[in-house]
Amino acid sequence: MPRALKILVIGMFINVTGASFLWPLNTIYIHNHLGKSLTVAGLVLMLNSGASVAGNLCGGFLFDKIGGFKSIMLGIAITLASLMGLVFFHDWPAYIVLLTIVGFGSGVVFPASYAMAGSVWPEGGRKAFNAIYVAQNAGVAVGSALGGVVASFSFSYVFLANAVLYLIFFFIVYFGFRNIQTGDASQTSVLDYDAVNSKAKFAALIILSGGYVLGWLAYSQWSTTIASYTQSIGISLSLYSVLWTVNGILIVLGQPLVSFVVKKWAESLKAQMVIGFIIFIVSFSMLLTAKQFPMFLAAMVILTIGEMLVWPAVPTIANQLAPKGKEGFYQGFVNSAATGGRMIGPLFGGVLVDHYGIRALVLSLLVLLLISIATTLLYDKRIKSAKETNKQASISS
């Protein structure tokens, strides 16, 4: 692993640790401390996610235009300014405005970071993106745990800790990346006929992202509707929190298992994703009969294995599909797809559960995951057809 990627991994860990001080506590803060309804809290979080989608697209575009260092620094500057504002102004309505700006700024950072990972270690393939993925999840585990402890003293300390960690992230990127060039990354697309195949590649990206949205829509239920369901059947909040602790530990420590599965059964990224989505289906199927904590724990363990196969594969494929000079845009597109799934998932799940119950939601999610498998199998069909056409044209000439 190149030194530049190691620095980026450390930076992303610090970044996500800081963000995770706040995001799990947003609803509690808005509802319990600001006195707003859960509906209002949901709308605020939707604004934050919507701004992140815009930031994802903007961050990818900026990476292609001004490079990784400037793009990430701009995103950090926007986010850091907003977080410093939250330290002093965290009442209503300043909170909603600043949290939305935080969503946009952090949204700029993520696709630029993924695109930079692919640029500084193009020969690393999935390993580069998997390293970023593991760092993010380690940050979520550490930040979520520490955030609850800090919030028990004062929410003001949560905002301060978030800002301080983001300031550290700023210095890591500034001193670690200002002399790194990312413009000469080797082309790793499926085809090198950009003029002929750019439309086919973008169509492949859209189809792939469609399945990615549905995957995240299903996954997001674990932190929303499924969380509420566990409370309704008598599983304590502390036990529910254990599920996410196990998730984080497995992601960090379970990489040898993922490597074994990939080498044994999933040499291609497409096969890796299909196996991952099938594992998702197994996990969600268990929820149809789950009534006790051990069943939810088993379902979470299985879900985590699936996500370790699917989530890092998508940015890797996007990097392979991207024509020269479009790496950032393609990363921004798949990042916005993930954010979009997380944004609409709670609303989708909430409506279904309110009107038809948890069983109807789970059955609907199983259908959506089957669609995700279909999109994964079909996303590159047009590219293969274009490649065949190019071969025939070259033979004829």
From Swiss-Prot:
Disulfide bonds: none
Organism: Bacillus subtilis (strain 168)
Intracellular or extracellular location(s): Cell membrane
PROSITE patterns (UniProt xref): MFS
Molecular-function annotations in GO: transmembrane transporter activity
Similarity comment: Belongs to the major facilitator superfamily.
Pfam families attached to this UniProt entry: MFS_1
Organism lineage string: Bacteria, Bacillati, Bacillota, Bacilli, Bacillales
Topology versus the membrane: Multi-pass membrane protein
Record bears the keyword Cell inner membrane: no
Name recorded for this polypeptide: Uncharacterized MFS-type transporter YttB
UniProt main location, coarse: membrane
Membrane-spanning parts: 5-25, 43-63, 69-89, 92-112, 131-151, 157-177, 202-222, 233-253, 269-289, 293-313, 333-353, 360-380
Keyword set, alphabetical order: Cell membrane, Membrane, Transmembrane, Transmembrane helix, Transport
GO cellular component annotations of the record: plasma membrane
